[in-house]
Design a protein with these regions (language model features):
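STAS-like cytosolic regulatory interaction modules
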Residues: 1-74, 85-134
Length: 134
């Protein structure tokens, strides 16, 4: 017999014990002088390729000023860090401009513990919003 105050939840076997992860997506927001790339969700080995491909497509379209906005990212692993390092190196060698808008604390922690926070080109979101892109 079930108490009227008992709340039961149902999980099928495929999701039992697993955290529900929001879907990953990459939004692109062209601004006047640059393009903002906004990954949402976990940036990891399964999704980094999507971000890399989208930025490559934007480069082919002629964009030469790219801001990666991490404010909607929920996680960043070593492949995500590697992507940011690669984008920075590529921008320096190929003459295009790259910047990063910081993400939430759990994302920024990855940059802090690896020493990349001081090495990569982080910009303030307010500066970017007011037309001062990378």
């Amino acid at each position: 017999m079930t108490s009227p105050y008992h709340i039961s939840t149902h999980q099928d076997e495929s999701t039992a014990g697993q955290a529900i992860v929001p879907p990953f997506r990459v939004d692109v927001e062209p601004e006047r002088e640059f393009v903002r790339v906004c990954p949402s969700g976990e940036i990891d080995v399964a999704t980094t390729g999507t971000v890399r491909e989208r930025i490559a497509d934007l480069m082919k379209e002629g964009f030469r000023r790219i801001v990666v906005d991490l404010r909607q990212a929920t996680f960043l692993d070593s492949t995500g860090l590697r992507l940011m390092v690669d984008l920075d190196a590529s921008s320096r060698s190929a003459g295009w401009r790259f910047a990063i808008i910081a993400g939430p604390a759990e994302v920024q922690r990855a940059f802090e513990v690896t020493g990349l926070l001081a090495r990569l080109p982080f910009v303030d979101a307010n500066d970017v919003t007011h037309g001062q892109g990378p």
